[in-house]
Amino acid sequence: MQSSDRDLSGPEASPSVMPEVLSECSPAPTKSTAFDLFNLVLSYKRLEIYLEPLKDAGDGVRYLLRWQMPLCSLLTCLGLNILFLTLNEGAWYSVGALIISVPALLGYLQEVCRAQLPESELMRRKYHSVRQEDLQRVRLSRPEAVAEVKSFLIRLEAFLARLCYTCESAYRVLHWENPVVSSQFYGALLGMVCMLYLLPLCWVLALLNSTLFLGNGEFFRVVSEYRACLQRRMSPKQEECVCEGSALQDAGGRAVVLDSTPAPTPTEDLTPGSVEEAEEAEPDEEFKDAIEEDDEGTPCPAEDELTMQDNGFLSKNEVLRSKVSKLTERLRKRYPTNNFGNCAGCAATFSVLKKRRSCSNCGNSFCSRCCSFKVPKSSMGATAPEAQRETVFVCASCNQTLSK
């Protein structure tokens, strides 16, 4: 400890020498520049203003390629193809000079004719999103600045996400992660090289232009819409022709039927009422069964009132139960499960003589022979007192099931 104290108290560690040594060893501290996020937003807006003409041009090209106005897109495609195929070398140089001179002239006229607005007018109108000078002059409030920063961050995040997705897609194509897409990409490149070598430049440009306009999905969408419109315009005429043809066929069929019917004798009366009376005069078994079924299925209200008077001791619940059982039976008869026109038992085809009869239990359609078994309604779960004596028609299988 003493030796160290002596070393520090020696001439090498004198106070006059120490500041010089420290000044030589430590560099001067530099002032760190602070990061201003709002200045970044202003720079981004200036960049948007600079690139606004290019953005408008891109929007116009996309508008034409998407066939939003089919006539303009078609005229543009045809006009560009004609220019590519007909212009010679001198004409191309003239077109290039025109493309250079027109933006220069427009920029000069815009700068000359622009009105100089005072700062107070800029502050009053909040004209900060039009020109870069306005962005430098106008002072935004804190909420407006925060909103601008948030909007910038959202756009930046979306741009970075799209850029990352594009890079990943290119990486997959270059590394053959999807062989089909990679083969298509390299095949297209080789085809373009061969096309540039074999065909003139004007033909290459015409083919490229036609591919851009006619090879996208929007073109096929427009074509399908126009095709559907033409079909709708032509369909009324076709419908009129079809209606006329069907009317002629109906008229011819009626004439044939009238010719084939025998001539009535003077003693016969062929009015609808007399025909029905003649048909109902001698009903066979099937008609008798059908008539019995209809009579039993639709009882008259007078009989219901009489039964209610006779059975005065019935409660309201029993009356409701009887009505519910009748309604379910009618629904079963009205909506049979077999609607194919054949008997579910013997497969006989229903006709005027072979009438359809629905089983009151399963609801299937049978002929009068297969559905000729009568069982009381109480066997199917009906609780009304009338169900003990009322019977309904069921099929053979349901009769066996209900009889057990």
From Swiss-Prot:
Acidic residues biased stretches: 276-299
Location (main, coarse): membrane
Xref: InterPro entries: Protrudin (IPR042405), Znf_FYVE (IPR000306), Znf_FYVE-rel (IPR017455), Znf_FYVE_PHD (IPR011011), Znf_RING/FYVE/PHD (IPR013083)
PROSITE patterns xref list: ZF_FYVE
Region Necessary for interaction with VAPA, residue ranges: 286-292
Binding site for Zn(2+) 2: 359, 362, 395, 398
Stored CDD domains: FYVE_protrudin
Biological process terms in GO annotation: endoplasmic reticulum tubular network formation; neuron projection development; neurotrophin TRK receptor signaling pathway; positive regulation of axon extension; protein localization to plasma membrane; vesicle-mediated transport
Free-text description of this protein's post-translational modifications in UniProt: Phosphorylated. Phosphorylation is induced by NGF through the MAPK/ERK pathway and modulates interaction with RAB11A.
Localization, UniProt: Recycling endosome membrane; Endoplasmic reticulum membrane; Cell projection, Growth cone membrane
Membrane topology according to the record: Multi-pass membrane protein
Positions of region (Necessary for interaction with KIF5A): 271-354
Residues annotated to bind Zn(2+) 1: 343, 346, 367, 370
Function: Key regulator of RAB11-dependent vesicular trafficking during neurite extension through polarized membrane transport. Promotes axonal elongation and contributes to the establishment of neuronal cell polarity. Involved in nerve growth factor-induced neurite formation in VAPA-dependent manner. Contributes to both the formation and stabilization of the tubular ER network. Involved in ER morphogenesis by regulating the sheet-to-tubule balance and possibly the density of tubule interconnections.
Subunit comment: Can form homooligomers (monomers, dimers and tetramers). Interacts with FKBP8; may negatively regulate ZFYVE27 phosphorylation. Interacts with VAPA (via MSP domain); may regulate ZFYVE27 retention in the endoplasmic reticulum and its function in cell projections formation. Interacts with VAPB (via MSP domain). Interacts with RAB11A (GDP-bound form); regulates RAB11A. Interacts with RAB11B (GDP-bound form), REEP1, REEP5, ATL1, ATL2, ATL3, SPAST, SURF4, KIF5A, KIF5B, KIF5C and RTN3.
Protein name: Protrudin
GN (gene name): Zfyve27
